[in-house]
């Protein structure tokens, strides 16, 4: 499966568009950035987790790209330069926000089940004809929730390497740190997320306390259920361990259409409620 964050672009054509855009050709600039608009938004959305914030940041990023296009010298891939601007916009934003608790999702689920009007609203949303519960989109949602418990720098490291599939060298350059520093930061981020998933996720651990994926599928009803996923599985021939399970989860995440898929409205509401609760706690 191709990476959701990598549009089909011919490098030679992109290079020509860059050159024309650097000489003030606005049409060329539009053609240059348009294939990246959806991947950029997806990355920003998963970093900041609120749609309105992501839309605002995307516009800011595109303005910065336009203002600085002449500074791009081709030392790195255009994708790296582009996502570098987006990354630092996200980091600036996230540094003004509280980090989320690892158990934030579970607390949100308890709040919903304890308030009949919230549960009724969720059931109504999930019963709409256009709604299909895609469990992979929820896994991507969960991944971003757990990532929000990391420092902004760790969150960016794991997103750049594991979801956008930049090399360690490219990701380190984007974050303006040495490669050893980046690798250490990524290792810490993966370790923290692995511990969190192992303790929470019933898809990889039968003693995991979070059955939200299965619970939401049950609420959706037979007509609105997508494909089931009993557990996250590693590829044949690969040993099952926390590292390989994390890699298998990341593969699902990078190809899930969280931003505009059929569960979009539901996850927007979940993110809004989580952000409100986590920002307001003392």
Regions of interest found by a model, annotated:
Residues 1-19, 31, 98-156, 166-282:
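Intrinsic, short, N-terminal disordered tails of RNA polymerase sigma-factor systems
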Residues 3, 33-52, 68, 94, ...:
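Amphipathic, Lys/Arg- and hydrophobic-enriched alpha-helical face
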Residues 22-23, 47-49, 62-79, 96-98:
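Sigma70-family region 2
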Residues 34, 55, 183:
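Conserved catalytic core of two-component sensor histidine kinases
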Residues 42, 56-63, 76-88:
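Structural recognition of an alpha-helix C-terminal capping motif at a helix-to-coil junction
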Residues 70-74, 84-105, 194-195, 199:
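Arg/Lys-rich amphipathic alpha helix in sigma70-family domain 2
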Residues 161:
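His-Asp-centered metal-binding catalytic motifs of divalent-metal-dependent phosphohydrolases/nucleases
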């Amino acid at each position: 499966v191709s990476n959701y964050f990598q549009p089909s672009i011919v490098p030679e054509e992109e290079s020509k568009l860059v050159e024309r855009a650097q000489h003030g050709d606005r049409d060329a600039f539009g053609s240059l950035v348009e294939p990246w608009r959806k991947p950029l938004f997806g990355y920003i959305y998963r970093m900041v987790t609120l749609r309105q914030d992501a839309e605002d940041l995307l516009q800011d990023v595109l303005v910065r790209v336009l203002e600085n296009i002449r500074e791009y010298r081709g030392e790195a891939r255009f994708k790296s330069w582009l996502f570098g601007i987006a990354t630092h916009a996200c980091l600036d934003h996230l540094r003004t926000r509280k980090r989320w608790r690892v158990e934030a999702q579970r607390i949100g689920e308890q709040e919903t089940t304890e308030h009949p009007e919230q549960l009724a609203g969720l059931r109504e949303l999930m019963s709409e004809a256009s709604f299909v519960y895609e469990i992979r989109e929820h896994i991507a949602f969960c991944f971003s929730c757990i990532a929000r418990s990391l420092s902004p720098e760790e969150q960016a490291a794991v997103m750049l390497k594991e979801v956008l599939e930049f090399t360690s060298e490219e990701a380190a350059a984007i974050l303006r740190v040495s490669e050893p520093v980046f690798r250490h930061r990524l290792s810490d981020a993966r370790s923290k997320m692995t511990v969190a998933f192992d303790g929470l996720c019933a898809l990889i651990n039968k003693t995991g306390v979070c059955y939200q994926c299965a619970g939401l599928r049950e609420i959706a009803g037979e007509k609105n259920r997508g494909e089931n996923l009993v557990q996250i599985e590693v590829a044949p021939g690969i040993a099952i361990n926390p590292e390989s399970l994390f890699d298998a989860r990341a593969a699902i995440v990078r190809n899930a259409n969280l931003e505009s898929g059929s569960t979009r409205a539901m996850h927007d509401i979940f993110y809004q409620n989580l952000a409100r609760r986590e920002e307001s706690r003392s």
